[in-house]
Amino acid sequence: KVMTIFGTRPEAIKMAPLVLELEKYPEEIESIVTVTAQHREMLDQVLELFKVTPDHDLNIMKSRQTLTEVTTRALEGLDNIMKEVKPDLVLVHGDTTTTFVASLAALYNQIAVGHVEAGLRTWNKYSPFPEEVNRQITGVIADLHFAPTQKSEENLLTENKKAESIYVTGNTAIDALNVTVNDDYKHEVLDKIGDDRMILLTAHRRENL
């Protein structure tokens, strides 16, 4: 049993191709998708795009939620699900609060953890905040480290992670692009722009709010 856990739009984009791949082998792998819905609306958009249906949805998002509230609700919910499902491996992605909490819940239940997009570091615990600490703690807990680049692998080796536990896999964002790039996407805004140049800016970083 392999349980993928994510809660935000960026996680969903990068984990969806992995979920789709796991589901190609139903006889060998029981794929279980669990979402915390740390970002509800943005998460649902991605799930619909990739046609991924969660097996478990904690739906923890609340207006003006604090990090403590997210952590508490996610930890309790994931602990209950893990006790019920008893997966053999938990896969998490990146550096969100969901990532950190899912890893911690797996540790408490003595379940192996695989960390996708492992090894990114700034070495400054407040930049990005709280993501740098989230990914460092997840790195301590993880049994398998799927690093996107050789630089990420070097960071993990610097932290004395075992070389045999590290796999340089590239970034699953490329896989997500390959899944969607052939879609004949149309939108009235794009029709109005025509061939004009466009800048797309997404700015929801905690530091910008």
Feature locations, PLM:
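A short, histidine- and acid-enriched strand-loop-helix "catalytic/donor-clamping" loop
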Residues: 115-129, 143
